[in-house]
Amino acid sequence: MNGLEATVSSFPSVKDSVPLTRTAVQRTKASVAVLHLGCEKNRVDTEHMLGLLAQAGYRVDGDEESANYVIVNTCSFIEAARRESVSTLMELAVQGKKIIIAGCLAQHFQEELLQEIPEAVAIVGTGDYHQIVQIIERVERGERVNAVTSSLDYIADETVPRYRTTHAPVAYLRVAEGCNYRCSFCIIPHLRGDQRSRSIESILREAEQLAEEGVQELILISQITTHYGIDLYGEPRLADLIRALGKIPIPWIRMLYAYPTGVTPAVVEAIQETPNFLPYLDLPLQHSHPQILKAMNRPWQGQVNDRVIERLRQALPNAVLRTSFIVGFPGETEEHFQHLLDFVQRHQFDHVGVFTFSPEEGTPAYHLPHQVPEAVKQERRARLMQVQQGITFRRNREQVGRVVPVLLEQENPRTGEWIGRSPRFAPEVDGVVYVQGQGSLGSLVPVQITRAEPYDLFGQVVAAPEGFSWSGR
């Protein structure tokens, strides 16, 4: 039994659905709904599919229950994501829906999905979503479509229609797709292909379009954002891209997935010199111990972790550092884990995500000896999160009394309270700021922080003090 069959067999009846991003499209002959699962890179794919459908004459509404077809853009990064995707598919199958399965699960298990889910009328790979209109037309003619290519070289640019699903003031901008690294635990290169970067000119044109739409925060994403341009220009060009984006009239530009080897002095200098580029670094370090990093096929990283973090702290004293770690990797001993705990306590990261190792078929780590028991993985995750919670709470308490810029994203109509984020919080993964006072949706306001909790802040809108920095520097 393969990984997908095991997952499907664990859902004899689907009852536990999860909150999903739901967007639907309709036209006279057939209606199509789109459900988005997974990461923000997957979200961009979803938004392009929606844009293409709208351009072809489909009408965007919001009801997949009455739709003739439901597109599910799936995730297959780890077992938990796969279970979420399969749960959604099985729920729709029980309802008798005609399902179009897109995204990473489709790329990973195309034949198995067609066999196990007869309600699937089409399978669309990660490099094929731009053909969604033609695929639906083929389905409507009675064809069962397998549109999964092994040539993963496509990346959408600013000319491909896009229907954004984020809050109005926030947009993600994908600067590259795919990954040239081969970490032993990661299936992404198999699902997304090797890195291919967009040109600086293409990225700037899309950023300008988003600025015209009123976007206040632009978030750069790719598998390894700090390696942007290597494949296209023969050298990293992130520093040049940062400076170029500094001329775009968007108040906040944030970068996610900044791998430590790419955080060069040139990149740090570009961040220093670009006022609207937030000093927020998301560094997916995965572990600290050299032996575990070697087993992860990241042997270079143990030599640069401390050096990069110290350089960032010196050059950008107000930098916000987020990272993620994997605990319970095969062969991880208590000594290795203690090394990680000490590393986290030493560097006092602002935000940390902790994942337990998920053995993925098709990766070298799946076959490694000395697999760690699930109970030990969970216990280590809890211990690390407990340590980090105290650090994050202390970092948040340091904000009390300060006046910081906050982007207002939601309003509670009953209380008039706003929910927003300061530069130290990225969407979805970090905390929020609860704000009292006057403002408008999608605006940036100065807020004095009055109270802190372990993950969130509370404050009051005030007048901007003299010399106030709208990027939180």
From Swiss-Prot:
| A single GO cellular-component term on record | cytosol
Q: Which Pfam families match?
A: Radical_SAM, TRAM_2, UPF0004
Its source organism is Synechococcus sp. (strain JA-2-3B'a(2-13))
| Described purpose of this protein according to its UniProt entry | Catalyzes the methylthiolation of an aspartic acid residue of ribosomal protein uS12.
Q: Report the main location listed first in the record.
A: cytoplasm
Any idea where the TRAM domain is?
A: 397-463
In terms of InterPro entries, this protein maps to: Elp3/MiaA/NifB-like_rSAM, Methylthiotransferase, Methylthiotransferase_CS, Methylthiotransferase_N, Methylthiotransferase_N_sf, NA-bd_OB-fold, Ribosomal_uS12_MeSTrfase_RimO, rSAM
Q: Report whether S-adenosyl-L-methionine shows up as a keyword of the record.
A: yes
Q: What is this protein called?
A: Ribosomal protein uS12 methylthiotransferase RimO
Record: residues binding [4Fe-4S] cluster 2? C179, C183, C186
Give its localization. Answer: Cytoplasm
Which reaction(s) are listed as its catalytic activity? L-aspartate(89)-[ribosomal protein uS12]-hydrogen + (sulfur carrier)-SH + AH2 + 2 S-adenosyl-L-methionine = 3-methylsulfanyl-L-aspartate(89)-[ribosomal protein uS12]-hydrogen + (sulfur carrier)-H + 5'-deoxyadenosine + L-methionine + A + S-adenosyl-L-homocysteine + 2 H(+)
Q: Which residues form the Radical SAM core domain?
A: 165-394
- One Gene Ontology biological process: tRNA modification
Record's family?
Answer: Belongs to the methylthiotransferase family. RimO subfamily.
The MTTase N-terminal domain is annotated at: 30-141
Q: Which residues bind [4Fe-4S] cluster 1?
A: C39, C75, C104
**UniProt remark on cofactor binding:** Binds 2 [4Fe-4S] clusters. One cluster is coordinated with 3 cysteines and an exchangeable S-adenosyl-L-methionine.
Keyword terms: 4Fe-4S, Cytoplasm, Iron, Iron-sulfur, Metal-binding, S-adenosyl-L-methionine, Transferase
Which Gene Ontology molecular-function terms are recorded? Answer: 4 iron, 4 sulfur cluster binding; aspartic acid methylthiotransferase activity; metal ion binding; protein methylthiotransferase activity
Q: What is its EC number?
A: 2.8.4.4
